[in-house]
Amino acid sequence: MQTPQVTVLGAGSYGTALAICFARKGIPTTLWGRDADKVAVMQTAHENEEYLPACPFPESLKVTADLGEALKDVKNVVVVVPSHSFSSMLKQAKPLLAEHARVAWATKGLEPDSGRLLYEVAEETLGDEHPLAVLSGPTFAIEMAKGLPTAISMSSTDQAFVEELSGLLHCDRSFRVYTNNDFIGVQLGGVVKNVIAIGAGMADGIGFGANARTALITRGLAELTRLGLKLGAKSETFTGMAGLGDLILTCTDNQSRNRRFGMALGQGKGVEEALKSIGQSVEGYRNTREVVALAARNEVEMPICEQIYAVLYEGKEPQQAAIDLLSRERKTE
């Protein structure tokens, strides 16, 4: 049997979609899922009926719940688990990684409690033995799985890794991969946009309209850029796929869980009720707390993120948060 060239860890909607994209090109791909019962269903159905119904698996994609089997002799590993599971996933995988393995992730978030970027977590856990890379950009899983045109950014600490992995994923007809040497900026864009998307959803849930949504996206981009520059990112990253691209998609399309969560809040649901109504992980909920703490540590002003935090964690009404934002002192753009 041919050794898989790519293993994707995490069989949710996005992990499954990425695995399909690799396998669609004929690349031997393994998708690992934690839940053995759900994996057995996928093995029988040849699709992920729970998250991506009617998206059949290519012949070169296999699914397993055996982590050792999934990682054996694999060169390219892509982690796609929620940010709160990222550290534990790496610790579980580390002793099973091949000596030559390179590790990428498509997780968008910060480490809970510490607020560290995920590359810091990966470096601490894996050391310098394995090259690292991150995938980020404006993508919805269902559209990727269906082969609809998509573009993302990929950044790495190792140029050979990013060139090879981007080449495996890139497809002239449906999937364009842009490489980017801003390892910090590509990661940060995927985090902050989740928070701003909650705000955009709240504004629409309240009924504020397109003008307010556009203003919020624009000023949200300014907040992202301020924080990114303070952390050493490049400003041009935030006008690319991993910044503005992801921000626009997540703030304007109802496929976004973060946006739908915000809309539910704007329509009067409480935080817990709104979270339950989504039915899947809402990364922006945790991201909000972590981003606000990160900004405070670095003395970066992020008023939109701060007001969203007040709604999620301090019981402020969304309407009052909007009033407080609009009542801020006028200033030069």
UniProtKB/Swiss-Prot annotation:
Q: Which family does it belong to?
A: Belongs to the NAD-dependent glycerol-3-phosphate dehydrogenase family.
- UniProt EC number: 1.1.1.94
Q: In which pathway does it act?
A: Membrane lipid metabolism; glycerophospholipid metabolism
Q: Where in the cell is it found?
A: Cytoplasm
| Keywords recorded for this protein, A-Z | Cytoplasm, Lipid biosynthesis, Lipid metabolism, NAD, NADP, Nucleotide-binding, Oxidoreductase, Phospholipid biosynthesis, Phospholipid metabolism
What the entry lists under NCBIfam families is as follows:
PRK00094.1-1, PRK00094.1-2, PRK00094.1-4
Positions with a binding annotation for sn-glycerol 3-phosphate: 108, 137, 139, 193, 246, 256-258
Instruction: Summarize the protein's role.
Output: Catalyzes the reduction of the glycolytic intermediate dihydroxyacetone phosphate (DHAP) to sn-glycerol 3-phosphate (G3P), the key precursor for phospholipid synthesis.
For this UniProt entry, the molecular function terms from Gene Ontology, in alphabetical order, are: glycerol-3-phosphate dehydrogenase [NAD(P)+] activity; NAD binding
* Organism encoding this protein: Idiomarina loihiensis (strain ATCC BAA-735 / DSM 15497 / L2-TR)
**GO cellular-component term (any):** cytosol
Asked whether the UniProt record includes Ribonucleoprotein among its keywords, one would answer: no
Q: Which gene encodes it?
A: gpsA
Q: In its UniProt entry, what is this protein called?
A: Glycerol-3-phosphate dehydrogenase [NAD(P)+]
Q: Where does NADPH bind?
A: 13-14, 34, 108, 141, 257, 283
Question: What's one GO BP annotation on this UniProt entry?
Answer: glycerophospholipid biosynthetic process
Q: Indicate the residues that form the catalytic site.
A: 193
Q: Name one Pfam family in it.
A: NAD_Gly3P_dh_C
This enzyme catalyses: sn-glycerol 3-phosphate + NAD(+) = dihydroxyacetone phosphate + NADH + H(+); sn-glycerol 3-phosphate + NADP(+) = dihydroxyacetone phosphate + NADPH + H(+)
